[in-house]
Curated annotation (Swiss-Prot):
GO terms for molecular function: acyl-phosphate glycerol-3-phosphate acyltransferase activity. It is found in: Cell membrane. Belongs to the PlsY family. It is a multi-pass membrane protein. The lineage of its organism: Bacteria, Bacillati, Bacillota, Bacilli, Bacillales. It comes from Bacillus cereus (strain ZK / E33L). This is Glycerol-3-phosphate acyltransferase 2. Catalyzes the transfer of an acyl group from acyl-phosphate (acyl-PO(4)) to glycerol-3-phosphate (G3P) to form lysophosphatidic acid (LPA). This enzyme utilizes acyl-phosphate as fatty acyl donor, but not acyl-CoA or acyl-ACP. Its main location: membrane. HAMAP family: PlsY (MF_01043). The gene is plsY2. InterPro entries: G3P_acylTferase_PlsY. Its EC number is 2.3.1.275. It comes from the Bacteria. It catalyses: an acyl phosphate + sn-glycerol 3-phosphate = a 1-acyl-sn-glycero-3-phosphate + phosphate.
Amino acid sequence: MVTTYLLFIVAYLLGSIPFALVVGKIGYGIDIREHGSGNLGGTNTFRTLGKKAGFIVTIADILKGTLATSLPMVFGLDIHPLWFGLAAVLGHVYPIFAKFRGGKAVATSAGVLLCYSPVVFAILAVVFFTLLFTTRYVSLSSMVTAVVAVIASIVSGDKIFIIAMCLLAGMVIYKHRANIGRIINKTEPKANFSKKQK
């Protein structure tokens, strides 16, 4: 039992590592919270620091979810791995290492799925990038993909999977509530795939 509680804490702390903040400060001398949307996630990193930093942060944020979700399997615990994944996403959104001001749950949630169900992860990746290249809205693509994740979990019939996806989708949509208003008002920034970045 003690090991279980400790691993939940480890999962949360893994999620709390603010890679966008670390990369910005160490690699560029910039506090990314003071630039762009102020969000500690991949999208703001891409827009503020460029493609290289954006890819590094996004991959690192994905791995946080993957590593946390794998903890019960690595340590032989008979506990559903998605609970640990949820702890990591909670850490990503409300990181103790960055005054509880983190990202929007997308990349770390993707990492949770990558570990738990690579097939669903692959399907959602196709959905996300199809929407992204069609609409050029990262936020809209993220929210719609989150809803599709819930549908996929319902189709699977796995009750814990359904609960976890509902919680993650709710968190993703909640963290994008300001984006929803900007999309409606047509003031939401679009991804610019042709623009040269650092």
